Amino acid sequence: MVVRPMMLRSSVAPGRQLLLSSARQRTASQWLSRAGASSRLSGQRFFADIKPPTTAAPTPATPSSESAVPPETVPKPSPAGQESTLPPSTPPTPAPKGGRFRRFLLYLLLTSGFAYGGGVFLALKFDNFHDFFTEYIPYGEESVLYFEERDFYRRFPNTLRNQNRLNPTPRDEGNKITIPSKSGLTSKVAEEEISGADVSQKGPHMSATPAQKSSEAQTKPAAAKPEDKTTAVVKAKEDKAAKEAEKKEEPRQPAIPAVTPLEFAQVNEGDEAIVQELVKTFNDMITVISADENSGKYSQPVAKAKEELQKVGEKIIAVREEARRAAQEEIQQAHATFDESARELIRRFDEMRAADAAQYREEFEAEREKLAHAYQEKIRTELQRAQEVAEQRLKNELVEQAIELNRKYLHEVKELVEREREGRLSKLNELTANVSELEKLTSGWREVIDSNLRTQQLQVAVDAVRSVVDRSAVPRPFVRELVAVKELAAEDPVVEAAISSINPAAYQRGIPSTSQIIERFRRVADEVRKASLLPEDAGIASHAASVVLSKVMFKKDAVAGSDDVESVLYRTESLLEEGNLDAAAREMNSLSGWAKILSKDWLVDVRRVLEVKQALEVIETEARLQCLRVE
């Protein structure tokens, strides 16, 4: 039910396009007719955005006449042609904000804009720079073309005024014939022209166009009958002479009214361009016939021609109605086709939905069977496990019973042995007492030997830790060696306290050796010397100056009792070379400010090394004390 309206709505759009395509094919292309327009603009087509109101076509006097456009129908100049050609003004510069980068970016944008505008101006003035600018500068060609078009519209503001006018189609009028003035005219017509004081009659005071049409209408009968040209001229001269004589001798006679002109043909239903053209041509013929004296004898043929013309208009209307009816039938047929397609689509959708429902049902049944099978397997497994537990419990009970039986058996055997000892082996107790004393002596010496062995092993483990700490090229963890020391200490509180005093990061990551401490101190000393030249609120310039001065600064000897950075560094380096890490760390700890902050990591490493060495010395001392206690 949702698809059908959408299908019907889509079927209406092609029907409208079919009806509008025939009207668009009859639309003529419109061209720019101004001589100043460029060749690029003259080759484009333009269509009217708004259809002008249709008015009754003026009846021309002759086929060669062209209808003049009244001044009120001339379209007003479009405001686009009168726009100012000045480029858009640059927006006012915002208030300067803090920050060098913002000012630099603002100046860069303004400079680029002025440079680009100057390039466009030079490209409009010089041809060589125009070629360079349009070829190598991005969007240069579009900018130059835009300003050229603006300049062209400024110089020719009426260029866009007549872009929707249709150029008159040239007509084949044949060879034009010029007839002398007053050729073939009678005295009656002359009198009518003389008596033209009536303002109700047509004349130059009403419109200049009908006079031109009448003059052109007079040329057509003369062109139609060239053999009567000479006779008409002679007759006109004789009539003129007789008229002058009558004026002198007799009084002026009243003018005879002119022949009543024939009515023009009108086809109200003929709104087609072809019908209007045919009516225009027929009216031209009526105008020519009306200009003749014997126009009365052509009234019946003209009336018959009007009827035929009306029939032609009716036939055209009938053909158009038939075409509209056929188009309506096609649209209805298309609607029916789309309705059938919509029903077919709905049917397919229902089939697909039913198929999907069946598939989902099958999948549901399959999934249900899988779940049931999984639950059955789970129940079977639980039962098997319960059975195994019961069997194991039974086995344990049997084992307990067997152990109890063995215990009873041993008790009975022991009682039997005691009885036997009381009888035959009375001296066995004395022998056992002697053996016990020997075992006590042996265990005492064994404890002494074990204590000495543990002390030696502890000393070896401490030496292994010291070798890892002092002889490794890179920091190496000594967790295994420290664990061995702790196991050999046999829960000695002194050794455990010494091991617990070591930082876990020291034996997990390792500690640097003395040479590494000295090498790192030299790198830290360089940075400390650089930082010693910086004030508290140092900026980028101060840091740069500190780096430069640290390169050229000379090292000085330590002065006794001096607390400056260079003296402290010199004393620390001397103590490190002597191997006195504790005193060196105390000297570096006396620094302050950035120097102390930069040497903080180095002090942490030195403290870790000192903690490990002190702990190892405590463990070695405890091992020696244990050896002395045993002795």
Swiss-Prot record:
Record has tRNA-binding as a keyword: no
Top-rank taxon: Eukaryota
InterPro entries: MIC60
GO BP terms in the entry: cristae formation
Mitochondrial matrix compartment residues: 48-103
Cellular compartments per GO CC: MICOS complex
Record keywords, A-Z: Coiled coil, Membrane, Mitochondrion, Mitochondrion inner membrane, Transit peptide, Transmembrane, Transmembrane helix
Biased composition (Basic and acidic residues): 225-252
Recorded coiled-coil stretches: 302-447
Stretches for region Disordered: 50-97, 160-254
Compartments (UniProt record): Mitochondrion inner membrane
Chief localization: mitochondrion
Feature: compositional bias, Polar residues: 209-218
Stretch forming the transit peptide: 1-47
Residues exposed to the Mitochondrial intermembrane side: 125-631
Membrane association type: Single-pass membrane protein
Pfam family, one: Mitofilin
Biased composition (Low complexity): 52-71
Transmembrane segments: 104-124
Subunit (UniProt): Component of the mitochondrial contact site and cristae organizing system (MICOS) complex.
Family: Belongs to the MICOS complex subunit Mic60 family.
PANTHER family per UniProt: MICOS COMPLEX SUBUNIT MIC60 (PTHR15415:SF7), MITOFILIN (PTHR15415)
Protein name: MICOS complex subunit mic60
